[in-house]
Curated annotation (Swiss-Prot):
Catalyses which reaction(s): L-lysyl-[alpha-tubulin] + acetyl-CoA = N(6)-acetyl-L-lysyl-[alpha-tubulin] + CoA + H(+)
Protein name, UniProt field: Alpha-tubulin N-acetyltransferase
GO molecular function: tubulin N-acetyltransferase activity
Segments forming domain N-acetyltransferase: 1-197
Keywords linked to the UniProt accession: Acyltransferase, Transferase
Length: 267
C-alpha cells in the first residue's frame, strides 16, 4: 500500500504508534485552520486509516470496517503502523513514498470473561481489536515484528491480552509464536487464555468484580425483579412495590456461537 508525501511527520520509523487522543487534538486544530503542511498530514492520515480499515474488513469478510479515522479519533485506542520507510535520496527528496505493510489496533474494554471453571470476571484488560498485514507481506515475519513491538511498548505479556473475535489463523499465530494453548471463548466473542486469570492482580488489569458460577453470571441490581421470556433469556423490569433493594439478576448464557470472521495476520 503506497502513500505519497504528506505523512513524513508521522511515519518516521518502521513502527509508528498513533493514539486516538492525539488524533482528536489534530482534528480540533484542523477545524481552526492548520497550515498547509499540517493540513496535508491530517488529510493523508485520515485516508490511510480509512483505507487500512477497509482492507482489514475485506480480509475478515466483515460487513463494514471496525477501524476508521472517525471512530479512532473518538476513542482512547492506539494503532501501531508498520511501514517500509524508504532511504532518503539526496537532501531535497525526502520520503516521497511510503509503503504501509499493516497495522495493529489495541485498546482497553470493560469485559465479562469466563475461565474454564465458570468463574465470571468483570475486568478492563488491554484488547486486540484489529490486526492486518498486507497479503503480499504475510508469512515473512512482519506480523510477529509488529506484535512484539506492541508487547514491548505496552509492557504486557501475550497471555494478559483479550482478543476480539480471533480467527483460527490468529489462534495458530499465538500458539506458534507465544506458546498459548486452549483458548477460552466468552459469549461476547472475546478470547482469553488460562494465564489471563492467573495474573488478575497484575497492574495491567483493572478488576471490577468476580463471581463464581457455572452457566450464569450474577450481578446485583436495585428495585428490580426477573421475568423469563419464551426464549429463556432474562429480562428485567422495575417493581415499585418491591421493598427489597438487593436482588440478583441472572444472565442466562446460551447458544454460544463462534463466528468465522478473521483477523488477517502473518504467521
Amino acid at each position: 500500500m503506497d502513500f505519497r508525501a504528506g505523512l513524513e511527520n508521522v511515519l518516521q520509523q518502521e513502527v509508528t504508534v498513533i493514539h486516538g487522543e492525539e488524533t482528536r487534538k489534530l482534528c480540533i486544530a484542523n477545524n481552526k485552520y492548520l497550515n498547509g503542511k499540517d493540513a496535508d498530514t491530517f488529510r493523508n492520515l485520515a485516508v490511510l486509516l480509512d483505507h487500512l480499515g477497509e482492507r482489514s474488513a475485506k480480509a475478515q469478510k466483515l460487513p463494514k470496517p471496525v477501524t476508521s479515522f472517525i471512530k479512532f479519533r473518538n476513542s482512547d485506542q492506539s494503532i501501531f503502523l508498520l511501514s517500509d520507510i524508504p532511504v532518503k535520496k539526496f537532501v531535497i527528496l525526502i520520503y516521497m513514498f511510503f509503503r504501509v505493510l499493516g497495522f495493529l489496533k489495541v485498546g482497553r474494554k470493560r469485559l465479562f470473561v469466563h475461565d474454564s471453571k465458570g468463574v465470571c470476571v468483570e475486568c478492563i484488560p488491554l484488547c486486540i481489536l484489529d490486526f492486518y498485514i498486507h497479503e503480499s507481506h504475510q508469512r515473512k515475519g512482519y506480523g510477529k515484528k509488529l506484535f512484539d513491538f506492541m508487547l514491548k511498548t505496552e509492557n504486557i505479556q501475550p497471555s494478559y491480552l483479550a482478543i476480539d473475535l480471533p480467527s483460527m489463523k490468529m489462534i495458530q499465530f499465538l500458539h506458534k509464536h507465544y506458546h498459548l494453548i486452549n483458548p477460552i471463548y466468552s459469549p461476547n466473542n472475546f478470547v482469553v487464555y488460562s494465564e489471563f486469570f492467573n495474573n488478575l492482580n497484575n497492574s495491567n488489569y483493572s478488576i471490577v468484580q468476580s463471581k463464581l458460577t457455572t452457566t450464569n453470571c450474577f450481578l446485583k441490581s436495585n428495585s428490580s425483579r426477573i421475568h423469563q421470556n419464551k426464549h429463556n433469556h432474562s429480562i428485567v423490569s422495575n417493581n415499585n412495590n418491591n421493598n427489597n433493594n438487593n436482588i440478583i439478576i441472572i444472565i442466562i448464557i446460551q447458544n454460544i456461537t463462534h463466528h468465522n470472521n478473521q483477523l488477517t495476520i502473518e504467521q
